[in-house]
Amino acid sequence: LVRDHGGPNQGYIRDDGVESFLIDCQYFDVVHIDPFKRFKSIKDAFRHTVKFIRMGLQVNPNIKFEIGTEEAIKSMPPEKLSSFLNQTYNSLNETEKDSIKYLVIQSGTALRENMNIGLYKEVWLNESIYLSRKYGLINKEHNGDYLKTDLIHKKFDHGLDTINIAPEFGQMQTRIYWNNFTSKERSKFYKLCLDSGRWKKWVDEDFDPDTEVETLVNICGHYVFSHLKFEMIKPEGLEQEINTAVSERISEILR
């Protein structure tokens, strides 16, 4: 069980991220340390990565870590990734080094509305995979949503180990719910999504939430599934349809 994006400023409020990180380390198998949302320089980011590794091991000596960040937070071409890894590992003892299992690498993924607008960088992919092998880490790319299946297969063929896909599956679930809502329920769901504000980071400045209703809902519907107001309008009996849709997409990717 992996917790993505632990660290400073990763929640709804700006904070140092320590309290939630230490709780996560007690209950997850792997926790992603990502200080880059707050600390943009390699120097600051590696220092806080080391700091969080040591704090995590104090509360759970068996915890494992994922390090690095995604392109949407900070662009990390191979030369910067190499510098980050070198400085991080030079600051750790052997036990601390062994706690790192995953490395986030980048090859051109970026989400905007319901699309992946990233430009594939094969050189970045190959060189970053080499770095992951050099340090004995499992590589992972974030924001793999909405990519063409053949491109995902191509990345795997080059040596990509794992890829994060989440909003794409959430959108599948959202569409199934939307198609089964009454008109009144759609209005309530849209209002819930609008008020959440979770759509704002995924759209351009000229996006009009009043006219692009379905786009807004598709972008952030999955963020409000745990809201009590959603529970009041949630359609029943759709679990099998949702599971089938998600399973078919996963099977397509893994072929």
Label the model's feature ranges.
Residues 1-3, 45-64, 87, 121-139:
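Alpha-helix-loop-beta-strand connector modules within alpha/beta enzyme cores
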Residues 1-59:
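Active-site beta->alpha loop and helix N-cap motifs at the rims of alpha/beta catalytic domains
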Residues 4, 67, 155:
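Conserved, mostly hydrophobic/aromatic
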Residues 7-9, 33-42, 64-80, 101-117:
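Active-site-proximal beta-alpha loop/turn segments in soluble metabolic enzymes
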Residues 10-22, 75-85, 146-158:
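Catalytic cores of alpha/beta
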Residues 26-29, 99-100, 133-137, 154-163:
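Glycine-enriched alpha-helix->loop->beta-strand junction motifs that scaffold or abut catalytic
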Residues 29-36, 116-120, 138-144, 164-167:
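Catalytic beta/alpha-barrel core
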Residues 138-146, 150-255:
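Flexible, acidic glycine-rich loops studded with aromatic residues
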